[in-house]
Amino acid sequence: MKSIKNILWIAPVCLLSVSCNGYNKLINSNDYDAKYAAAMNYYNENSYSRAAQLFENLTLYYRGKENAENIGWYYAMSLYKEKDYFTAGYQFKRFARQFPYSDRLEEASFYSAYCKYMDSPDYNLDQSQTKEAIEEFEMFAERWPRSTRIPEVNTCIDELRKKLIKKDYEIAYGYYFIEEYHAAYESFKQFLSLYPEATMREDAMYYMLESSFLYAINSREDKMYERLQQVVNDFDKFNSSFSNSKYLASAQNIYTRTREAMANMKK
């Protein structure tokens, strides 16, 4: 009984060993047609890691040949299915450059952007990848405005912009929190210009107003009046945009104190 159990345990290990040995021999083989057939078979059986390795191995040999486009496409797709989005995105972009007349060009361009979307980090980290993804999606929408992918592209852009909105708002608020009021003012001003759709525009505009006031009131005397006048302008914009704001009482207090400071400077 014990020997039967040992056989049952050893059998799959042997099969795995044979399978691995066969795969390793295939990788080192010069039979490229067999490699190509095996790569397609692995891909169709969802063995994407092995498929990707074989397709990569075939790329140089088939360059400029009949199957080059297919290999480039399935190599990129294998990496994508393996969730290696960084390398997959690079390969989709490379495919688009190498095969500009391919029937798969639209899909390759979409996946190039989508891989950057999938690789985009949390909002509190560096957002270079996020910005690149937005740029690629916008280029895709401009080139294929009637693509069936457009709704998905727009959804992805909206999600990516939400990350940028949150990050830039927290940067601006961080300056306000540490009392760097000039930097806070400029950051909130840029935020409002860049993100007209932001849900925290009211908060941003109020903190910009308060930063404007605190920067002005602590300025040198020869600069103060001009900066106080800017506070008045900022209040007018805030009051016009959010006349029923939860910050209205505080904003009106800032306006009153600003007018008083300006009047005192004229005495």
Language model segments and positions:
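Acidic, polar-rich low-complexity tracts and alpha-helical solenoid repeat scaffolds
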Residues: 2-7, 19-267
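Bacterial N-terminal signal peptides
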Residues: 9-17
